[in-house]
Amino acid sequence: MQLKLRWITILIVFVVSLFFMFPLDKRINLGLDLKGGMHVILGVETEKAVQAKIDTLTGQIRKELRNSKINFAFVQKNESGKISIGLSDPAERNKVKDLISKNYPILKESGLNSDEKVIELSLDTDEVKRIKDYAVEQAVQVIRNRVDQFGVNEPVIQRQGKEHILVQLAGITDPERAVKLIGKTAQLKFYLLDENANNEETIKSGNIPPDDIILYGKKIDKVTGQIVSTIPYVLKKDAVLTGDYLLEAEVRISSQFNEPYVSIKFDPAGSKIFEEITAENVNKRMAIVLDDNVYSAPVIRERIAGGEAQISGSFTLEEAKDLAIVLRAGSLPAPVKILENRTIGPSLGQDSIKKGIWAGIIGVAAVIIFMLIYYKFSGFIASIALLSNAIIILGAMGMFKATLTLPGIAGLILTMGMAIDANVLIFERIREELRLGRTPMNALEAGFEKAMSTIIDSNITTLIAGLVLFQFGTGPVKGFAVTLTIGILSSIFTAVTLSKTIFLTLYGNKEIKKLSV
């Protein structure tokens, strides 16, 4: 009965393994080094996230001082990246400080300015750290959302260190497009034009009002797709609406010009803001700005309800699709720069697969030949366990959707050797028992029983190392850890359960005088 239960267990393991193993090309995900693709390390410019927060706070403070009827000369970010508040009346200094202390606890007075009419504020050190850390975490999530919409299987997107992000996309066919998609900041903002300052004379003189900024649009030749010229726009410094309220973004084709554009829709809160802005600024121009580039600056003809707008700019269909993807996925909290960009061609990956397979075949064949010569029929049983081990490992990888890498193949070959090592321990123990004068059947039982603790101890030690590598390793190291961990568990099963079951089936009910070991 116990032997029957053993065979049922083995059969279940093999059926499940074969089910998840085939077809190999669909069940086993290949890593970057085998399938080809791109490996990119991005650096998040976290300091710009801090400066963006200061810009936002500057606008909020300016608005709050106006609402509180406090007269001020200016509220602006100075050259050192701090917020400077210029007071019209020094007597209101304490009133302003109380307002800041109450509503903006993350801001601290620098105390370096001796002018009674100027209050200089900087972000708290802990807040700066929080902003930088959040910027990287959010960037990882945004990039992951973009890649998911791009349709890449098993992408690797993870944080490295304080400000770096690792991106590995296996099987990518257009790495240049993928890099653009990943690296685009996609900060969507809406600004009102300063109609009084938006003229050639003001722009040429550079005498821009302190509450304004100049951004540029691009005039593109529709035939060649080349930039013909840039168009300056003088905009009110504070954005009236941002992409944070964006709900949908999809590509549509203009019936008038037969060109693709991106239709966007805001959530209820954004729709309300958009409606209020358009109602208050009829016959004025509003610029649609993406990553500091003005895409269009249409005149608001009437109140716009429903929260819908469109971004047009002589896009190709692919450009419009990519823009819709990055807008849906959200904007990066800070720009990213490419620190490392490597592309691995599919032919190089195929070459690695062939070499890895041949290395495995030669290694396994050499081991089987040695086992047959040295351990005779017992070596044949060990060889069956060895090949079974490979099936179980590949089946487990298919079940857990693990990714096979070149180091993973090395881990697979290593565990095959470890599986044989377990059988060698058992066989040597059986030989030792036979030399002590035990009967073949007693020597067989004693060999498996006494070798068990050594096999378990050695494999548990390696298993712990594999789990540590899996937890803290990245890329190739993690791929090696996956096959190593699965292989260790599989080798214990095949050596202890499968090999012993075969021996018991062949010799369990027989009087044997000699073991071929």
From Swiss-Prot:
Segments spanning the bilayer are 5-25, 357-377, 380-400, 407-427, 455-475, 479-499
Where found, per UniProt?
Cell inner membrane
UniProt keywords, alphabetically: Cell inner membrane, Cell membrane, Membrane, Protein transport, Translocation, Transmembrane, Transmembrane helix, Transport
What superkingdom does the record give? Bacteria
Q: Which InterPro entries does UniProt cross-reference here?
A: Acrflvin-R, SecD, SecD/SecF_arch_bac, SecD_1st, SecD_SecF_C, SecD_SecF_C_bact, SecDF_P1_head
GO cellular component term, pick one? plasma membrane
Does this UniProt record's set of keywords contain Amino-acid biosynthesis? no
Gene Ontology molecular function: any one:
protein-transporting ATPase activity
A biological-process GO annotation: intracellular protein transmembrane transport
Question: Hey, which family's this protein in?
Answer: Belongs to the SecD/SecF family. SecD subfamily.
What does the protein in this record do? Part of the Sec protein translocase complex. Interacts with the SecYEG preprotein conducting channel. SecDF uses the proton motive force (PMF) to complete protein translocation after the ATP-dependent function of SecA.
Assembly, per entry: Forms a complex with SecF. Part of the essential Sec protein translocation apparatus which comprises SecA, SecYEG and auxiliary proteins SecDF. Other proteins may also be involved.
Per its record, how is this protein called by name?
A: Protein translocase subunit SecD
Q: Which organism is it from?
A: Calditerrivibrio nitroreducens (strain DSM 19672 / NBRC 101217 / Yu37-1)
Gene symbol?
secD
